[in-house]
Each structure stands twice: as C-alpha cells, then as structure tokens.
C-alpha cells in the first residue's frame, strides 16, 4: 500500500434492527383501540366509515317472525343527527362485508378487523333465541365465511340486548359445530348490551357456557348528554376486566361523538369507542396526551386478549 493511499472507513449500522425492536416494544405497551363505526347498515357505509377512521363497525340485525335474520336495519328512534332508515338485506350485506374483509378483493379494507352485530332480538319470544342463533350461524357461514373457503377475516361480536336470550349463543355455537366448522368460533365473541348489572351478565354467560371472548358494552344514545349517564358502570366493567377473576376481556363505550367524552372514556381505560364520527376518535388518539398510551388496533391484535390498566 502506497503511503499516499488511505483506507476508507467502515461503518456498522444497527439502527434498523434496533428501531424495529423499539417499535415492537412501544407497540406492546400501548393499549390497542377499536374505533367502532355506529349503525353501518347500508353497503356503501362500510367504505364511508372506514375511510373516516373506523377499524371496526357496528351493524344492526333485525329478525322476521320465524327468527331468520332479515335486514340490517335500525329504524326510529336512533341517534341524533343520523338517518335511522338505511338498510340492506342481511345476506347481501354479509356479501359486501366479506369483500371488504377478504385480502385481495378489490373492495378490501385492511384496517377493518372487527364487526359488532347488534342483534335486535326484541321482536322475538325468549324460546326463539336458540333458533335465531342457529339461523344466524348458517347465514354467516354461507355468505360471510364462504363455507370456510377464504371467507371474510374480520372478528365478529354477537351483541345481544336481552340476558334471557343467552341461548342464541348456544344455537350459534352448536350449529357451526354441526356444520363442520367449529374452528370459526375462534373468530366469534360476545356482548350483552342491555346495561344490566355486571353480576347478572356474568350469570348469563355461565348459563351459555361462555368463558372468554367477552366484550362488555356500556353507554347511551348520543341524544342524551353523557354527563347524565356518566361512566360509573363503564368503570365497573373496567374493574372487572382488570381483576384476577373477572369475566370481561374488553370494554367499549357508546355512543361517543364529542372530544371531551372521548378523552374521559380513554382516561378510564376502555378498549373501544362506538361513534358516529370515527374521525373525532382518531383525532383524540393522535393527541399528545394519548398517542403514547394508545394506538389503533390492527388484525394482529387479538380482540379476545385482555389488556389491563
């Protein structure tokens, strides 16, 4: 080597790996949040709400007199500043939902990972609950899960308003088993949405043989100021979730459209917020007080896994 030549310095860069490890650690320490678009009952609203920031939607399901799921329809009254009468035939909605949650489809939304079916079983007799669950399972199996052949991938929550209708869960579960697809129950969770006493809800799950995959809702229509209802029951649900012997895995609060109420809900540690304005919730998630503690849930987040305060 001539004296005039110099060796080029060699640098070892570890930053990408360190950065990835840091990202994983930070992600693990942040509570995953489901922004739940409320009352998504027309096919076109799937795109609308996801584009506004929702990673989850809630859809109303009405039943006919024979306990067949018939329409995605809410009807009047509903939340203030919303049109209550948008609807679709249930099976047609399921097909649109399948396209929106199947990778590779032209209508696919990677962000849409959870669907809450608000089951309007109030029109049914208590002894029809099992049949409603059975027929709901058959419809989902055919039109959403595509009979187990590359169907929609979203997680599903069956939200039931009446504790007396716990046999809907039994009918749903037993039908998937009979039809040869018990593995799909891994994608299914539960919610009793009637704002009942937490202990009474626990008893209904016991009757239904449910020991996991539980979301607990709490809330009131946006037509009533949130401070009138308050967050007392939601706090009890969070306390149950965080206890060593609680039955709740996730807690969501509804219907939240205001920035102040969103912050209050995040402050007590909810996992999901149902809203008519997903962009409001997304904006709060990005505020400096919250972006270090919370993040938008993705498909990699198990919605049946408990994240305690």
Curated annotation (Swiss-Prot):
Q: Where in the cell is it found?
A: Secreted
Q: Where is the active site?
A: 38, 74 (nucleophile)
Query: Per UniProt, what does mutating residue 74 to N do?
Result: Does not release choline from LPC
Query: Which of UniProt's keywords are assigned here?
Result: Cytolysis, Dermonecrotic toxin, Disulfide bond, Glycoprotein, Hemolysis, Lipid degradation, Lipid metabolism, Lyase, Magnesium, Metal-binding, Secreted, Signal, Toxin, Zymogen
Q: What is this protein called?
A: Dermonecrotic toxin LarSicTox-alphaIB2bi
Propeptide per record: which residue ranges?
Answer: 2-27
A GO biological process of this protein is:
lipid catabolic process
The positions flagged as glycosylation sites are: 286
Source organism of the structure: Loxosceles arizonica (Arizona brown spider)
Describe the family membership recorded for this protein in Swiss-Prot or TrEMBL. Answer: Belongs to the arthropod phospholipase D family. Class II subfamily.
């Amino acid at each position: 080597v001539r004296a005039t030549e110099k060796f080029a310095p060699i640098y070892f860069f570890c930053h990408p790996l360190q950065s990835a490890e840091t990202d994983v650690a930070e992600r693990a320490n942040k509570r995953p949040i489901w922004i739940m678009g409320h009352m998504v009952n027309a096919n076109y609203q799937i795109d609308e709400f996801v584009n506004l920031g929702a990673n989850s939607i809630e859809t109303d399901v009405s039943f006919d007199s024979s306990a067949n799921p018939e329409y995605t329809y809410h009807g009047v009254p509903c939340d203030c500043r919303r049109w209550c009468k948008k609807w679709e035939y249930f099976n047609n909605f399921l097909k649109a939902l399948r396209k929106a949650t199947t990778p590779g489809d032209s209508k696919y939304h990677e962000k849409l990972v959870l669907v809450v079916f608000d089951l309007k079983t109030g029109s049914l007799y208590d002894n029809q609950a099992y049949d409603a669950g059975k027929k709901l399972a058959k419809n989902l199996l055919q039109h959403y899960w595509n009979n187990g052949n590359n169907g929609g991938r979203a997680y599903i929550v069956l939200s039931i308003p009446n504790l007396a209708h716990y046999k809907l869960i039994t009918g749903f579960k037993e039908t998937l088993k009979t039809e040869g697809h018990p593995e799909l129950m891994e994608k299914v969770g539960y919610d009793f949405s009637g704002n009942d006493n937490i202990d009474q809800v626990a008893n209904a799950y016991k009757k239904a043989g449910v020991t996991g995959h539980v979301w607990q809702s709490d809330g009131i229509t946006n037509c009533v100021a949130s401070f009138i209802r308050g967050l007392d029951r939601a706090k009890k649900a969070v306390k149950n979730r965080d206890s060593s012997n609680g039955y709740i895995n996730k807690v969501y609060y509804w219907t939240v459209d205001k920035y102040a109420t969103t912050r209050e809900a995040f402050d007590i540690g909810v996992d999901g917020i149902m809203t008519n304005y997903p962009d409001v919730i997304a904006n709060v998630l990005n505020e400096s007080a919250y972006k270090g503690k919370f993040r938008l849930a993705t498909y990699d987040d198990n919605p049946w896994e408990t994240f305690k305060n």
